[in-house]
Design a protein with these regions (language model features):
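Short helices/loops that flank or line small-molecule/ion binding pockets
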Residues: 17, 41, 45, 59-70, ...
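Periplasmic-binding protein-like
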Residues: 93-129, 159
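Surface-exposed aromatic
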Residues: 155-162
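Hinge/capping helix and adjacent helix->loop/strand transition within the periplasmic-binding protein
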Residues: 1-60, 109, 122-155
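Alpha-to-beta junction loops
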Residues: 20-24, 48, 66-75, 88-91, ...
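Short beta-strand and adjacent tight-turn residues that come in two discontinuous sequence segments
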Residues: 55, 74-75, 94, 119
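Extracytoplasmic "Venus flytrap"/periplasmic binding protein-like
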Residues: 4, 82-94
């Protein structure tokens, strides 16, 4: 939520959604995106509704969220972290099954009373079809070594990646 939002907790949001069905805007990076589907799952599990505002990517979502053109969004933590740290966004919940080590004070959806709505995203490394097995092994080993390196782990955490 934008830091200036009157909604300080998920309970505030739920109360507003129930009192004002179909009024609150939820921005997403596009139809069918993980943030769009997270909002749909949230509405389903809470018996509420909102206005889905699809954008063409996360950049325009952030711009309009910060500019109060839309009221809320579900977004990946690494996208939100710089604005959270700057005090421009207020995280209300984490959608994964457990709290984030990056924002340990922020409760999960389940802790906040929303059951069966755990969502998290992940990143992958892909190669071309037919990549030789020895190259796959070398690539895997290099990635595992990199993420095990404390300096790399810190850089990833600083970018909002766990």
């Amino acid at each position: 939520m934008p830091a200036a939002s009157p909604h300080k907790t998920l309970a505030d949001v739920l109360a507003y959604l129930k009192a004002n069905p179909g009024k609150m805007t939820f921005a997403s990076s596009g139809n069918g995106s993980s943030d769009h589907l997270t909002a749909e799952l949230f509405w389903l599990q809470t018996g509420t509704s909102g206005v889905h505002v699809p954008y063409k990517g996360g950049g325009p979502v952030m711009q309009d969220l910060l500019g109060a053109q839309v009221e809320s969004s579900f977004m990946n933590i690494n996208t939100a972290m710089p604005q959270i740290k700057a005090g421009k966004l207020r995280p209300l919940v984490i959608t994964s099954a457990r709290r984030s080590t990056l924002l340990p004070e922020v409760p999960t959806l389940e802790e906040s009373g929303v059951k069966e709505a755990n969502v998290q995203s992940w990143q992958a490394v892909a190669g071309p079809p037919g990549l030789p097995a020895d190259i796959k092994t070398r690539l895997r080993d290099a990635i595992l070594a990199a993420v095990a390196d404390p300096a790399t782990a810190k850089r990833l955490a600083d970018m909002g990646l766990e």
